[in-house]
């Protein structure tokens, strides 16, 4: 989707594309504090999504410290723009893209669901709906932690990169979720971001998943019958019907 070797994605299409109408596309952005993991760790989500008749894509991006988070945001936006332009070629509906991500992937998904403050119109990369799992929406608390050794954020850049302080006017319908056993900071940031979205008139649902923590909550997203899975597929139906 872009000029770098890291600018790749996996796009997996359901069998019903052969004769059917264009289907929704579910896009996942992996976590790893912007410095670890890859799209390979996301592919387990695809099976249930394909079984439901939807297309699935997992995005790769460059990692810190080779690049700054600003570039990662640009790369993910580029990937979304590419996916939105390629729907007619692959048989999915470019107007029915659901973007989801976990942890740092939720941060990146949020950044791909808003326009920068100077922009007056909706951007080409913004999806139809967003699902944010255990996300990070204010980055300044990370500055004085070991996580920032690779990120190299300043206070100013952390503020610029925080969805909590962004223009949310064009943000799509959103599900924000976190685990019962998350840290208080993850819970607080999720709730604060949801409040900001609702304050701007965005349709938002929140969900605390019982018994789940920062690392295993994503398994509930892959489970159609789990608490989060039910809300996830209900959102897809609501947005895409």
Where would I find each of the regions flagged by the language model?
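N-terminal cap/lid segment of alpha/beta-hydrolase-fold proteins
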Residues: 1-20
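Residue-level signal for short, function-critical loop segments
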Residues: 15, 32, 180-182
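Short beta-strand element of the alpha/beta-hydrolase
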Residues: 21-32
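Catalytic nucleophile-loop/oxyanion-hole region of alpha/beta-hydrolase
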Residues: 37-45, 57-96, 222-223
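Primarily recognizes the serine-hydrolase "nucleophile elbow" in alpha/beta-hydrolase
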Residues: 78-145, 159
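The feature captures the conserved acid-bearing segment of alpha/beta-hydrolase catalytic domains
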Residues: 123-124, 129-143, 155-192
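C-terminal catalytic histidine-bearing segment of alpha/beta-hydrolase fold enzymes
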Residues: 177, 187, 191-194, 198-241
């Amino acid at each position: 989707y872009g000029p770098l070797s890291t600018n790749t994605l996996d796009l997996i299409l359901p069998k019903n594309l052969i004769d059917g109408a264009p289907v929704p596309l579910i896009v996942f952005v992996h976590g790893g504090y912007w410095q670890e993991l890859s799209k390979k760790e996301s592919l387990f989500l695809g099976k249930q999504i394909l079984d439901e008749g939807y297309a699935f894509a997992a995005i790769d991006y460059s990692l810190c410290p080779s690049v700054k988070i600003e570039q990662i945001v640009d790369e993910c936006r580029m990937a979304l723009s590419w996916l939105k332009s390629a729907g007619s070629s692959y048989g999915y509906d470019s107007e029915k893209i659901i973007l989801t991500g976990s942890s740092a992937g939720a941060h990146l998904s949020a950044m791909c669901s808003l326009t920068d403050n100077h922009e007056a119109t909706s951007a080409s990369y913004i999806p139809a709906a967003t699902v944010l799992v255990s996300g990070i929406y204010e980055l300044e608390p990370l500055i004085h932690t070991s996580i920032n050794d690779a990120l190299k954020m300043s206070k100013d850049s952390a503020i610029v990169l925080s969805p909590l302080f962004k223009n949310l006017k064009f943000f799509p319908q959103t599900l924000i979720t976190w685990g019962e056993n998350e840290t208080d900071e993850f819970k607080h940031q999720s709730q604060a971001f949801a409040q900001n979205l609702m304050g701007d008139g965005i349709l938002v649902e929140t969900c605390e998943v019982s018994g789940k923590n920062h690392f295993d909550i994503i398994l509930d997203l892959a489970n159609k019958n789990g608490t989060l899975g039910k809300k996830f597929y209900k959102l897809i139906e609501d947005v895409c019907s």
